[in-house]
Structure formats: structure tokens, C-alpha cells
Amino acid sequence: MDGIKYIVFTEKSIRLLGNNQYTSNVESGSTRTEIKHWVELFFGVKVIAMNSHRLQGKGRRMGPIIGHTMHYRRMIITLQPGYSIPPLIEKRT
């Protein structure tokens, strides 16, 4: 899982699951083709569309020094009907 950082669980991403669309944050340097190839290879699914947007890092302040966190990219991956990605969360006991 080089390119994908983690799966996003927001109200919008949960709503998109009904349309067979999965939302995840990926490395900002990753391209759509890399992520599409990786998802198809790793999960054995067929990707028909990908939407992405770049999110700015949040501002951070440490005393007089002002900085920011890293930028990242969010991908919305649409799969062909009949395919699905299994949940990536493991239950902790």
C-alpha cells in the first residue's frame, strides 16, 4: 500500500459507498494512473472512473515559528457494478 495512506470516513464518503464509490487519501505525488493500476491489481476490481482533488495542509504554530502540515490528495474511486472493496479496518479486541 505505497500510494494509499488511509480510507476516509466522512458523511459524504459514506453516502458515496451506495454508488460504489470509495474515498481515500493518497500520497500527493501519486498520479491517477498509478493509483488506478494499484487498486485494480491489489483488490482485483475494475475501476471505471477516478476523481481527485488536492487538500491544503493545516497551519501549525510552535511558539513564534509558523508552519504547516503536508499537503495530500483525496481520490474518489468508482468501481464497475458488481465489484466491491472489502473493509480495511480490523477489529481490535
From Swiss-Prot:
<dbReference type="GO" id="GO:0009507">
    <property type="term" value="C:chloroplast"/>
</dbReference>
<comment type="function">
    <text>Binds to 23S rRNA.</text>
</comment>
<keyword id="KW-0934">Plastid</keyword>
<dbReference type="InterPro" id="IPR013025">
    <property type="entry name" value="Ribosomal_uL23-like"/>
</dbReference>
<dbReference type="GO" id="GO:0006412">
    <property type="term" value="P:translation"/>
</dbReference>
<dbReference type="Pfam" id="PF00276">
    <property type="entry name" value="Ribosomal_L23"/>
</dbReference>
<dbReference type="InterPro" id="IPR012677">
    <property type="entry name" value="Nucleotide-bd_a/b_plait_sf"/>
</dbReference>
<dbReference type="GO" id="GO:0005840">
    <property type="term" value="C:ribosome"/>
</dbReference>
<dbReference type="GO" id="GO:0003735">
    <property type="term" value="F:structural constituent of ribosome"/>
</dbReference>
<dbReference type="InterPro" id="IPR001014">
    <property type="entry name" value="Ribosomal_uL23_CS"/>
</dbReference>
<dbReference type="GO" id="GO:1990904">
    <property type="term" value="C:ribonucleoprotein complex"/>
</dbReference>
<protein>
    <recommendedName>
        <fullName>Large ribosomal subunit protein uL23cz/uL23cy</fullName>
    </recommendedName>
</protein>
<comment type="subunit">
    <text>Part of the 50S ribosomal subunit.</text>
</comment>
<keyword id="KW-0689">Ribosomal protein</keyword>
<dbReference type="GO" id="GO:0019843">
    <property type="term" value="F:rRNA binding"/>
</dbReference>
<keyword id="KW-0150">Chloroplast</keyword>
<keyword id="KW-0694">RNA-binding</keyword>
<dbReference type="InterPro" id="IPR012678">
    <property type="entry name" value="Ribosomal_uL23/eL15/eS24_sf"/>
</dbReference>
<comment type="similarity">
    <text>Belongs to the universal ribosomal protein uL23 family.</text>
</comment>
<keyword id="KW-0699">rRNA-binding</keyword>
<keyword id="KW-0687">Ribonucleoprotein</keyword>
